[in-house]
Every structure is written in C-alpha cells, then in structure tokens.
A protein has these predicted regions:
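Cys/His-rich metal-chelating microdomains
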Residues: 16, 32-33, 121
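Short, non-ligating residues that shape and space the ligands of small metal-coordination modules
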Residues: 19-20, 35-36, 124
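Residues immediately within or flanking Cys/His clusters that coordinate Zn2+
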Residues: 7, 26, 115
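Short cysteine-rich clusters marking metal-coordination/redox-active sites
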Residues: 10-13, 29, 118
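Cysteine-rich micro-motifs
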Residues: 23-34
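Exposed aromatic-hydrophobic patches
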Residues: 63-64, 101-108
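Short amphipathic, basic-aromatic surface patches that mediate peripheral association
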Residues: 64-72
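Short acidic/polar inter-strand loop motif in beta-rich domains
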Residues: 119-126
Length: 126
C-alpha cells in the first residue's frame, strides 16, 4: 500500500516517485511493486547525510550533513526537500554535482522537516 508523501524506487530501472495523493494501490513500475525508501537506514556516514535545518529570515537553509557532503559526478545529492510538519507546504530543490550540498526555501512554516536523496546512499531525513 502506498504511503502519502512516501518515496518509492523501482529495483529494476531505478525510477523514483513520490506519492502526492491517495494511499492505494501499491506503486508499480516495470511490472512490479516499487520499494518504499526508508530514511536513514543505509550504512553510510551520518555526519555527511543527515540534513541540518537552519532558520533564516523568511525561511530556512538546509545543509546536507554537519560535514558537507561531497558533490562529484559519481556521488552527489540529487535533491533536497522541505516539508511543513502539517504537510501543507512541500518544496524540493534539485541539485547537480557542481552545486553546493544545500538549498534555501522561503516559507513562514514554523515546524519543518527536511529530507535529501544521495545517489549512492539513498534517502535521509533530519
């Protein structure tokens, strides 16, 4: 069964999707169910993957890791997402290997959660 705002990856082709509406049926790709990605479950350097959220005037800056995550053509952060605790605000910033591992979001939401996706080490939440 699909989870609202869940991130799913196809084990066959590597497609990644996020469920924005509905909770049924299971998310399918390549004729099979997609795997739900669970945050912070890959064995990797936590200090380089857990997003760090900083409140700034008019919004937030999300830095990937307390130690900056490497950004190279073979290992990088693909995107950073900020969601309000109530789920009413969702914004994602796509990154390239030449970008810094951070993103700025404009919102007046008081309580937020950040997630990021590393091309090698999966989904992380902070």
């Amino acid at each position: 069964m699909a989870e609202l705002l869940g991130i799913y990856k196809c084990a066959k082709c590597g497609n990644i999707v996020q469920v924005l509406h509905g909770e049924k049926p299971p998310v399918m790709c390549c004729g099979q169910g997609m795997d739900r990605l669970v945050e912070n479950t890959v064995d990797a350097a936590v200090e380089k993957h857990v997003p760090v959220v900083e409140k700034i005037e008019g919004g937030y800056v999300v830095k990937v890791g307390s130690v900056p995550h490497p950004m190279g053509s073979d290992h990088w952060i693909e995107w950073v997402e900020l969601t309000s605790e109530d789920g009413m605000f969702i914004q994602r910033q796509m990154l390239t290997p030449s970008d810094a591992p951070e993103a700025t979001f404009k919102t007046d939401a008081e309580k937020v959660v950040a997630r990021e996706y590393c091309n090698l080490h999966g989904l992380w939440k902070g």
